[in-house]
Amino acid sequence: MNPFSSGTRLRDMIRAIRACKTAAEERAVVRKECADIRALINEDDPHDRHRNLAKLMFIHMLGYPTHFGQMECLKLIASPGFPEKRIGYLGLMLLLDERQEVLMLVTNSLKQDLNHSNQYVVGLALCALGNICSAEMARDLAPEVERLIQFRDPNIRKKAALCSTRIIRKVPDLAENFVNAAASLLKEKHHGVLITGVQLCYELCTINDEALEYFRTKCTEGLIKTLRDITNSAYQPEYDVAGITDPFLHIRLLRLLRVLGQGDADASDLMTDILAQVATKTESNKNAGNAVLYECVETIMAIEDTNSLRVLAINILGRFLSNRDNNIRYVALNMLMKAITFDDQAVQRHRVTILECVKDPDASIRKRALELVTLLVNENNVTQLTKELIDYLEISDEDFKEDLSAKICFIVEKFSPEKLWYIDQMLKVLCEAGKFVKDDVWHALIVVISNASELHGYTVRALYKSVLTYSEQETLVRVAVWCIGEYGDLLVNNVGMLGIEDPITVTESDAVDVIEDAITRHNSDSTTKAMALVALLKLSSRFPSISERIKDIIVKQKGSLLLEMQQRAIEYNSIVDRHKNIRSSLVDRMPVLDEATFNVRRAGSFPASVSTMAKPSVSLQNGVEKLPVAPLVDLLDLDSDDIMAAPSPSGTDFLQDLLGVDLGSSSAQYGATQAPKAGTDLLLDILSIGTPSPAQNSTSSIGLLSIADVNNNPSIALDTLSSPAPPHVATTSSTGMFDLLDGLSPSPSKEATNGPAYAPIVAYESSSLKIEFTFSKTPGNLQTTNVQATFTNLSPNTFTDFIFQAAVPKFLQLHLDPASSNTLLASGSGAITQNLRVTNSQQGKKSLVMRMRIGYKLNGKDVLEEGQVSNFPRGL
């Protein structure tokens, strides 16, 4: 007999496929068999239909397409015999899913079989419906399934309950139809029916709030009694698993009680005793007992429970941490991370065990335990926990050092009791895992060092000793090079010795040796080499006796393949050779970097509630990155070419703070084209924003000069961010310089502002702030409107760092004068005024419209309010 003939049995086809040695042979066998099956389908021979479908199911499991046999499933389902129906329903569940249109044709057959007199046929239909039920089928067949929940046979009731779960997931609107039927299943004695009934109730509670309240009031006590009976029941062989009576039912009941007790104190009180009983009586030496205990802990943590029961639950998790099974330890760590929000002290008792998990060979457990330890750290235990983590950092795997060092740095920055301790711990991390430390961490360390003037000598000596031993740690070398460049004289002269230090002797040549090694080492990157060059330039002034050696090291870098290094070497050599008279002032110590300002810039320029556009940072010469600033255009949802204006709250660049423009490129580009004219406002001229006043022209020229300082010296940028801007004094003199700017005219004086009158408006009002606009026109210039904004504080708290920003469409031009103050007193006891000038290029055709943003600090927290003004008077 040919093994591939139409009469091949399923067993023979499987044997032939398994005998194939290559995938090509297998495809040939399957292709031949599928062709024979298609031929038989076309002949519509009912004799071999069940055999063909069985073959198709096997072929489908191998991954080959079998869509041509879907109609055969429907034909077998419609046949009267039970064997044919069984194969047909099996094929239906395997070859089809709920997205197939063919399912529309099987709904009628399912309805007939659900009403069949043979309970086994009913069971087949329920199984199929529970597996592939679609929303349309659920609506059509829900009444039959609801009726079958009350069927006399427990197997049918069990399958009907599972099928009901599928139906309410697909069509939540049908949930209320199954509430009473589901409640009746909770009284069943048959464990199979009971567990499906509990699952159905659980689904109903998560989908329908009314069902949740119904089960909470009507069924909570019954569920508690059922759980108590199962917990206290005698040995039952048919349900016993490792000494636990039906752990699956235990778990389902606990999950349902968790939903019922969550957010309801009365229901939680009812289940307190049984949860304590389950937690204390369940054995934890087998996996089944651990599963029940875990669900019990989950329930205790979720309900409105007392602290005593939560302490019991946390102690159970502590025992889990000592288990040899990695899965149990992992879930215990996960649960403890949730439990720490409820009872920190109870979790702290297991701190030693959790620390041991950080050293676990399993990577997942190590990472989760490290996250938990980070949550456990506070001001009282930071010293002990940090010591433990740093000790482990020395022997940890390379793969784990990055995560571990990042967490240690986070802990040290957040909880350090003093700067000396902070510096010591950071140096230990840099020594052990310096190459894994991120840039912002060592930047922050430098900021802290610069602020700790009494520790400059101690720090530079500690770094010098560390870099001699751990020269392969790139980040450590960078910090050491920076500190030696800044405080090399303190290193050589042993200035600022602390009692905990041992005296060391370091010569000027020794200090330069460290810098030379950093710049000549083959694996040093460009950042380290650039920082080393800067340090050499600074040491040439601090160590005049070896300035020639320093000069020789700098000259060697003229031949560097890196353009940046070449340029620096040439410029620094010129400074050492030709500009000795200004060298000492050029290489003076950097001004103290403001920690608060640095932290703000590190976290972002705007509050977290304001979305900022991703933008590359601006690299500054000392390696510190300037964070990008979100453009006001994006914040106010206007077109990118709309014109915007706002007064700068500090001495920083107008463009950088408001528009997010690269201040280095803009200033350099302008300087390359022409020299700035004295007394002209270059920024406003470039942007064509409006007509500046002479006083503002002079300050803008100063602002342009400060741009170069910001680029060359980040510390100036940090300082200017926190310094208030000087108020501008309007004057009417020096009008001749405006003739150079294509007919721009000086700002109108108050005496000349007496155009037509317009009614004032309330531009913006919230529960805490009110903004009023008053308007006036300049005679002979109807396109320009003078607006005076008055800001009133309606809240009982004073606003500080107040700033008003605005943006207008591109047919408008906007100019803002400085505000009268940056502090807005509480309860309307004082007001801030600010003058705006709006030029409407389409005056008479389009009305004024403005988007505005108001920022201020309330009790030290940044607050941001936004609004749109569209109720300007007509004619503006």
From Swiss-Prot:
GO terms for biological process: intracellular protein transport; vesicle-mediated transport. Subunit of clathrin-associated adaptor protein complex 1 that plays a role in protein sorting at the trans-Golgi network and early endosomes (TGN/EE). The AP complexes mediate both the recruitment of clathrin to membranes and the recognition of sorting signals within the cytosolic tails of transmembrane cargo molecules. Adaptor protein complex 1 (AP-1) is a heterotetramer composed of two large adaptins (gamma-type subunit and beta-type subunit), a medium adaptin (mu-type subunit) and a small adaptin (sigma-type subunit). Binds to EPSIN1. Interacts with DRP2A/ADL6 (via C-terminus). The gene is GAMMA-ADR. One of its GO terms (cellular component) is nucleus. Its main location: Golgi. Transmembrane segments: none annotated. SMART domains: Alpha_adaptinC2 (SM00809). Gene3D superfamilies: 2.60.40.1230, Leucine-rich Repeat Variant (1.25.10.10). Residues 756-873 form the GAE domain. It is a peripheral membrane protein. It holds the Pfam family Adaptin_N. Belongs to the adaptor complexes large subunit family. The lineage of its organism: Eukaryota, Viridiplantae, Streptophyta, Embryophyta, Tracheophyta. HEAT repeats lie at residues 97-135, 136-173, 248-284, 308-345, 346-382, 384-417, 418-454, 506-545, 560-599. This is AP-1 complex subunit gamma-1. The keyword Repeat applies. Keywords: Cytoplasmic vesicle, Golgi apparatus, Membrane, Protein transport, Repeat, Transport.
